[in-house]
């Protein structure tokens, strides 16, 4: 091979490699532009839904939490004076940075619909056969992830339940295979959702704009958030998310109406019996 041709080929190869490196770097950093860093390991993002709702602004609000820097807390009215209070009040009373519904509750206004245990306290001792996701945190065993959504169709819960102090059972939305497991429905509503991403970060997810569960799962799978799996927490006016840290404060509340009228619907936050909250770990 002539020397001139050799240098031409090598130059072209180097340019291609540089282009690949640049492209890969662009991909790896592309998600960061959607997140506002509030503190180390703590981000807030507001995403435009690709599916527009006829009610409200079609925004999806997400708090991303790195469990390396934050601890998770389950607070239950059954363990704290049996008093239901708003997510904001739960935060103020227990020094939480953020709080979201821990799940749907029964007619008594206190007990979770699915199994719920927090250390020695049992809010609901019975597993719900219809609910296939269990949020687990406060590990007993340092070998397991600090927080995870256990998929009852994919994982051995009987072994894993012994490895965590806190367990919260709810409805599975995104499976361990990243599949939408909800069928389509006509009903639409606001939603609070808990997710985990592929980096092991926890996601507090909220949409005030109402969607069917099936459609909202597809929205989450389409967003640039690297979502791994997700479980349903609450819907309608009971759905709540509160956040306050370093001058960033917001309170998200589900709306009462689920029709197709245009216009904003500003609802007051409902008192709720059970929340998942976060606090910063000591250095």
What are these model-predicted stretches?
Residues 11-16:
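Hydrophobic membrane-insertion alpha-helices, especially the h-region
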Residues 94-95, 121-279:
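Active-site beta-strand/loop microenvironment that shapes enzyme catalytic pockets
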């Amino acid at each position: 091979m002539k020397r001139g041709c050799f240098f031409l080929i090598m130059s072209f190869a180097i340019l291609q490699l540089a282009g690949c490196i640049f492209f890969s770097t662009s991909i790896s950093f592309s998600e960061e532009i959607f997140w506002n860093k509030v503190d180390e390991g703590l981000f807030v993002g507001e995403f435009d839904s690709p599916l527009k709702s006829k009610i409200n602004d079609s925004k999806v609000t997400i708090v991303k939490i790195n469990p390396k820097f934050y601890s998770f807390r389950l607070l239950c009215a059954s363990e704290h004076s049996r008093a239901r209070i708003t997510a904001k009040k739960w935060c103020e009373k227990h020094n939480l940075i953020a709080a979201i519904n821990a799940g749907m509750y029964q007619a008594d206004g206190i007990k979770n619909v699915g199994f719920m245990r927090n250390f020695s306290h049992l809010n609901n001792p019975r597993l719900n056969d219809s609910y296939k996701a269990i949020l687990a945190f406060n590990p007993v065993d340092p070998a397991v992830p600090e927080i995870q959504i256990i998929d009852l169709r994919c994982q051995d819960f009987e072994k894993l339940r012994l490895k965590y102090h806190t367990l919260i059972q709810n409805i599975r939305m995104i499976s361990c295979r990243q599949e939408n497991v909800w069928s389509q429905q006509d009903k639409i509503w606001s939603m609070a959702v808990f997710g985990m991403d592929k980096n092991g970060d926890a996601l507090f997810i909220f949409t005030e704009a109402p969607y069917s569960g099936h459609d909202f799962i597809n929205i989450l799978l389409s967003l640039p958030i690297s979502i791994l799996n997700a479980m349903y927490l609450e819907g309608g006016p009971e759905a709540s998310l509160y956040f306050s840290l370093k001058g960033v404060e917001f309170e998200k509340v589900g709306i009462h109406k689920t029709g197709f009228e245009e216009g904003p619907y500003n609802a007051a936050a409902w008192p709720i019996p059970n929340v998942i909250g976060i606090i910063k770990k000591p250095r």
